[in-house]
């Protein structure tokens, strides 16, 4: 006799829970959408208009995740800001080319649909989109029993931005004697967490009982969209760098023209307390610099005469300051002095 009791739900996939999550996302999205073309979450694809004020639009796309910061979120059972991190990691890359973020999509894979957890994550994503002035237009939630262990998940984001061809920030605009301006980070952002978790494990630090680390490690990545796009609009910058994994050396080199180098004055960098703590745990200067942002989350390359002009576009906590300059060379990053931990 045949047994016809096999169902998708018995295999570990709850379609009804997934549908309820889509409805929740749609309700969030509709609250802040002004353009009817955006109201299509749950469809097969998302449609949007190209803003009329961008005369010769160039498309810029970026995708990223938040790495093992999700493990810290899981340990602390705190999921309301990890979505902001996800948006930040994508849109901060878009603005390096001078692009305005237009749309954002997310991908969440999880062992079992947990609406409480997922609702908090998506609220954070929605908040990140609001800060970035872009729209959450869709995504994918994959319930994957057997792939992830109990309670585990991963998230990824994808964002598209537009920039007028005449305003694209490319290497050709960067010249000798341009200043390298550091813009403070909000903290660790979303890079280096595998090393942080290794330190916590090796030092047997109980994260839940450490108020300082709980607060610092879950601070959301700073989104620089508003400030940088104002500078692009005012034609005050020649280049941008998002300081992520690889630190100063691994990221600044990516925007240098072939015959130019960067001089970085490490002694001018102002490390936040979390970086001082990490250094005190036995992480060498070299490892700190190539793994973490060390207090500088974003850099802009500007003409010397524009420094005073850009300061007014930043709040008190994110006031920019000079950390280096562009010199002749062969795409080298020259690190001068030491960071004062």
Language model regions located:
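Glycine-rich phosphate/pyrophosphate-binding loop regions near the starts of catalytic domains
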Residues: 27-186
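Short beta-strand-to-turn element immediately C-terminal to the catalytic PLP-Schiff-base lysine
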Residues: 49-50, 160, 201, 300-302
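Acidic, glycine-rich loop-and-beta core segments that form the ion-binding/anion-interacting portion
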Residues: 176-215
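Acidic/polar, glycine-rich intrinsically disordered N-terminal extensions of enzymes
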Residues: 8-32
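Short helix/loop capping segments that flank catalytic or ligand/cofactor-binding pockets
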Residues: 69-70, 190-192, 233, 252
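Glycine-/charge-enriched secondary-structure boundary and capping motifs
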Residues: 2-12, 27, 117-132, 148-153, ...
């Amino acid at each position: 006799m045949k047994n016809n009791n096999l169902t998708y739900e018995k295999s570990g996939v709850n379609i009804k829970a997934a549908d309820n999550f889509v409805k929740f996302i749609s309700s969030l999205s509709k609250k802040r959408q002004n353009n009817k073309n955006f109201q299509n979450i749950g469809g097969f694809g998302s449609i949007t208009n190209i803003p009329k004020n961008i005369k010769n639009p160039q498309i810029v796309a970026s995708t990223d995740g938040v790495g093992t910061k999700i493990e810290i979120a899981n340990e602390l059972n705190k999921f309301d800001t990890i979505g902001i991190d996800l948006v930040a990691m994508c849109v901060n890359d878009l603005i390096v080319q001078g692009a305005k973020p237009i749309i954002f999509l997310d991908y969440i894979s999880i062992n079992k649909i947990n609406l409480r957890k997922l609702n908090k994550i998506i609220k954070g994503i929605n908040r990140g989109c609001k800060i970035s002035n872009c729209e959450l237009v869709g995504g994918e939630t994959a319930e994957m029993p057997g792939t992830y262990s109990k309670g585990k998940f991963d998230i990824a984001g994808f964002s598209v931005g537009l920039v007028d061809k005449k305003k694209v920030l490319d290497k050709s605009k960067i010249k000798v004697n341009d200043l390298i301006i550091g813009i403070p980070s909000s903290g660790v952002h979303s890079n280096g967490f595998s090393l942080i978790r290794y330190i916590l494990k090796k030092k047997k630090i109980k994260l839940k009982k450490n108020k300082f680390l709980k607060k610092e490690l879950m601070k959301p990545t700073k989104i620089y969209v508003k400030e940088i796009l104002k500078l692009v609009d005012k034609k005050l910058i020649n280049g941008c760098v998002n300081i992520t994994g690889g630190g100063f050396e691994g990221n600044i080199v990516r925007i240098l023209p072939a015959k130019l180098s960067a001089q970085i004055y490490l002694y001018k960098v102002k490390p936040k307390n979390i970086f001082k703590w990490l250094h005190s745990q036995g992480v060498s200067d070299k490892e700190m610099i190539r793994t973490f942002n060390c207090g500088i989350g974003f850099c802009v390359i500007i003409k010397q005469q524009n420094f005073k002009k850009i300061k007014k576009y930043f709040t008190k906590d994110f006031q920019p300051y000079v950390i280096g300059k562009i010199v002749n060379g062969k795409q080298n990053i020259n690190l001068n002095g030491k960071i004062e931990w």
